């Protein structure tokens, strides 16, 4: 679960 959240956060930051 935490890993998925971190992955999503990283994806959003990369999108910026």
Curated annotation (Swiss-Prot):
Domain of life, per lineage: Eukaryota
Keywords noted in UniProt: Amidation, Amphibian defense peptide, Antibiotic, Antimicrobial, Immunity, Innate immunity, Membrane, Secreted, Target cell membrane, Target membrane
GO annotation terms (biological process): defense response to bacterium; innate immune response
GO CC terms: extracellular region; membrane; other organism cell membrane
Compartments (UniProt record): Secreted; Target cell membrane
Disulfide bonds: none
Location of Leucine amide modifications: 16
Tissues where this protein is expressed: Expressed by the skin glands.
Function according to Swiss-Prot or TrEMBL: Shows more potent growth inhibitory activity against the Gram-positive bacteria S.aureus (MIC=50 uM) than against the Gram-negative bacteria E.coli (MIC=150 uM). Has a weak hemolytic activity against human erythrocytes (LC(50)=135 uM).
UniProt family annotation: Belongs to the frog skin active peptide (FSAP) family. Alyteserin-2 subfamily.
Official protein name in the record: Alyteserin-2a
Organism of provenance: Alytes obstetricans (Common midwife toad)
């Amino acid at each position: 679960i935490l890993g998925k959240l971190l992955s999503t956060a990283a994806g959003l930051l990369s999108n910026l």
